[in-house]
Amino acid sequence: MAELQNDRFLRALLKEPVDQTPVWMMRQAGRYLPEYRATRKQAGSFMDLCRNKELACEVTLQPLERYPLDAAILFSDILTIPDAMGLELRFQTGEGPIFDKPIKSMSDAKKLFVPDMASELGYVMDAVSTIRKALDGRVPLIGFSGSPWTLATYMVEGGSSKTFAKIKAMMYDQPATLHHILDVLADSVIAYLNAQIEAGAQAVQIFDTWGGVLTPRDYKEFSLNYMAKIVDGLKRENDGRKVPVILFTKGGGQWLESMAETGCDALGLDWTTDIDDARARVGDKVALQGNMDPSVLYASPDRIREEVATILEKYGQGTGHVFNLGHGIHPEIDPEHAGAFIKAVTELSPKYHK
């Protein structure tokens, strides 16, 4: 593998000194880019795009051709694991992901298995190694997975949900069933992320998109415990270099201390937590990633720059901050505005690293 030319993203995650604050965007390869929309059309369906290593590589690199980003993130979907378990994933226009075989009972849950990474999910690893080769050491490649709780919400609800009624009913009425599902998912995520690391991912992120819908007690029992199990099972070094792990619970600002205890290297923050408060609470233990509201990108480039300046000032001097949005970039954002965001971080952050 080619020598890494820009490692400031990895260094910041490990709280090592950097020359400026590294920056990337969740969903940076996505629908806001016209070139992504063209490749997506060429692929046919969304999952066909994920399964074609050349096209997945192409869309992963597209934002790097436009912007001076400090990391690339694998183009894939969090639902690849449940799909490989035989739940038959499809995407319905306007509705999002749908599973034709949702899990309703313990007998359904008992049929779940840890997918074979080479045969069932080999297309993901092929994409990782193809992208890593194409990057040729420009920037590190991030691998990722959904958290067990977040994956389970889709598997039990049969798709997206606003109320999470089915999974919460299972959680309160059949907790043993839900724990069984989460256990199999945690083992699957460990195998999945380790396979991505073997294939060339240089950092990994666990996306707990729906952890924030839980009570504090339920969050610990049904989400955090399983993420801690994953962190514990991950390969933390490859090619003689540490592989940092980022945990991101959307809406998880109240639980940062507990999250920092898992042994992860960094915590993702959404925009509902002040980064200065987060640093005061857990900055001695972990790096922080975030946390501009993605909706700021609808505003003018001057307003975007102001917001970037505020967040940099709130975090303050020194390393341990990776600049990002507080969640994925919205599909309607003007690519020029995303560019103004990246430019502001690269121009305004060096003074915090002197």
Curated annotation (Swiss-Prot):
Entries under HAMAP family matching the protein: URO_D
Reaction catalysis annotation: uroporphyrinogen III + 4 H(+) = coproporphyrinogen III + 4 CO2
Gene Ontology terms, MF aspect: uroporphyrinogen decarboxylase activity
Quaternary state and interactors: Homodimer.
Pathway: Porphyrin-containing compound metabolism; protoporphyrin-IX biosynthesis; coproporphyrinogen-III from 5-aminolevulinate: step 4/4
Highest taxon listed in the record's lineage: Bacteria
Protein name: Uroporphyrinogen decarboxylase
Site (Transition state stabilizer): 77
GO CC aspect terms: cytosol
EC number of the protein: 4.1.1.37
A Pfam family per the record: URO-D
EC category: lyase
Entries under InterPro entries matching the protein: UROD/MetE-like_sf (IPR038071), Uroporphyrinogen_deCO2ase_HemE (IPR006361), Uroporphyrinogen_deCOase (IPR000257)
Residues involved in substrate binding: 27-31, 77, 154, 209, 327
Subcellular localization(s) per the UniProt record: Cytoplasm
Keywords, ordered alphabetically: Cytoplasm, Decarboxylase, Lyase, Porphyrin biosynthesis
Organism this protein belongs to: Hydrogenovibrio crunogenus (strain DSM 25203 / XCL-2)
PANTHER family on file: METHYLTETRAHYDROFOLATE:HOMOCYSTEINE METHYLTRANSFERASE RELATED, UROPORPHYRINOGEN DECARBOXYLASE
Presence of the UniProt keyword Cytoplasm in the record: yes
